[in-house]
């Protein structure tokens, strides 16, 4: 099998992006894991696959696979790279691009300043739709592990997120708590774990341990989930700068029932071709 690909990143969250409209490729979990290996493969956090639309009201179908081969519902940084890729490769000439995902639909807008704004949809706090095991929605939940008791918010941005407010992200024990939260029994489909330091009402610092990928340089949906939780807990304003290890994202949300907007860059690194 021979195919072309692009390597891209959104604030250091890196992707292998493949056009599966003009190329016929099947990505098995084993192949994805081999390609994701940073020593013997291409190396990436996620594989992004561009497919023809499943829905006549959309322009493309957007699929995301983690480095462990699992398919996931959402990736905000990937969505920005997806938009740049389909424009760069001549698959569309639109500046506003409608895509479907495993869990819903998104609108990707290429801005004049070369940034990309993604309409991430309406944050979902209903436990059963996250999914999260709880009797009713709460602004803050208590999660217990064998040795830790954590106060967290939970939300779906098309994929599940748990958010813990910390005093300092630099000293947060992400390496220990990330895996414990990711596989916590109250999240039946596992979860992305965010650790948020509130600098002020319009700025936060964030580290994210991603489900199936580990800690990444940036997580777009994680930034969105963190801000949504922060706003519902009364900690943040409607417009927030999120400072991640890989760079900054700007998140805007007017509150319950309203769509959340994420704005940030998407960088093309190189094009390549593989035979495997």
Swiss-Prot record:
Question: Any idea which UniProt keywords this protein has?
Answer: Amino-acid biosynthesis, Cytoplasm, Isomerase, Lysine biosynthesis
Q: Where is this site: Important for dimerization?
A: 270
Q: Does the keyword Amino-acid biosynthesis apply?
A: yes
Q: Which superkingdom? A: Bacteria
Enzyme class of the recorded protein, top EC level? isomerase
Q: Which residues bind substrate?
A: 13, 46, 66, 76-77, 159, 192, 210-211, 220-221
A biological process (GO) of this protein is: lysine biosynthetic process via diaminopimelate
| Entry EC no(s) | 5.1.1.7
Q: Which InterPro entries match?
A: DAP_epimerase_AS, DAP_epimerase_DapF
**Pfam family of the protein (one):** DAP_epimerase
Task: Using the UniProt record, give the first listed, main subcellular location.
Answer: cytoplasm
Which locations, inside or outside the cell, does it occupy? Cytoplasm
* Pathway recorded for this protein: Amino-acid biosynthesis; L-lysine biosynthesis via DAP pathway; DL-2,6-diaminopimelate from LL-2,6-diaminopimelate: step 1/1
Catalytic activities: (2S,6S)-2,6-diaminopimelate = meso-2,6-diaminopimelate
Please give the Gene3D superfamilies that the UniProt record associates with this protein: Diaminopimelate Epimerase, Chain A, domain 1
| Catalytic residues (positions) | 75, 219
Oligomeric state and partners?
Homodimer.
Q: Which family does it belong to?
A: Belongs to the diaminopimelate epimerase family.
Q: Which NCBIfam families match?
A: DapF
Name this polypeptide is given:
Diaminopimelate epimerase
Species lineage, top-down? Bacteria, Pseudomonadati, Pseudomonadota, Gammaproteobacteria, Vibrionales
Could you tell me the gene encoding this protein?
dapF
